[in-house]
Amino acid sequence: LTGVNSSFSDNAATGQNANGGNGGNGGAICLDGPAQSGDKDIAIDICGPIRPGTETAIPASTPEDLAETADLVKNLGRRIVTAEVDVRDYPGVKAAVDSGVEQLGRLDIVVANAGIGNGGDLLHETSQLDWDEMIDTNLSGVWKSVKAAVPHIISGGRGGSIILTSSVGGLKAYPNCGNYVAAKHGVVGLMRSFGVELGQHMIRVNSVHPTHVATDMLHNEGTFKMFRPDLENPGPDDMAPICQLFHTLPIPWVEARDISNAVLFFASDEARYVTGVTLPVDAGSCLK
């Protein structure tokens, strides 16, 4: 079980972008997307474990990680505002978004990328705590992030783009991670509902559905052991053949940049009339 981040970016060229932006998919989105389309960012991150006082297989993000992301963005010649915020904390998210827009001027693009991963239990054996943390972060956290941002997009009067990070697990089911699957399916419902309601403001809403991504949420001791319980000390090379079985393409996982490229498309003018789309970046996983 681990917590990840959320971030918000202000884009001078195409507006402002909100996304999960401190390492992994979020870091790639922050660095690749805005680098191509604008020059201002707002990044928020939990900067700590999702469950304080506990150790997890996946290292929790830190204030230093967020500062490093900010430095990388600044090195690209862009402005960035950061805040340590948990997406479960709506007042905190709203305050960060409001402050960022006040400092940077506008909001046109939202990428709701924050989320956690856990697994191993059958759904009927999942603890109440694990269920609540998953839904509160991966579903309610997405809703809270978009809720905080939408008034700024509407008031700008320019339309905009909202991109929600779901998962292949938001399009199909897998055993032993039912709370994750339920939350990610819920993200699709959020995407479609926001899309129906916000279309009148020329705000497009879409979702991206990654398969395994080569980040710390996949490459960690707990996941290695989950995929290869037959080995005493499994590593990524031991897990790769199992991961490849999920795909029609002969690869075990995709890279964070593959996700940021999909996000960049949805945020761009090339997708100006694209809304309500569930886009798998899955190496053919949905075909199996």
Residue ranges and their predicted role:
Residues 167:
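Residue(s) in the substrate-gating loop at a strand-loop-helix junction
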Residues 199, 204, 274-276:
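Short, small/polar-rich loop/turn modules that mediate ligand/substrate recognition or access, typified
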Residues 120, 172, 250, 263-264, ...:
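Short C-terminal tail/terminal secondary-structure segment
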Residues 146, 183, 191:
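Active-site helix of classical SDR
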Residues 151, 196-197, 272:
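Alpha-helical segment proximal to the catalytic Tyr-Lys
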Residues 4-34, 40-42:
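Glycine-centered low-complexity coil/loop motifs and glycine-rich tracts
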Residues 121-123, 127-135, 243:
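Substrate-binding pocket helix/loop in short-chain dehydrogenase/reductase
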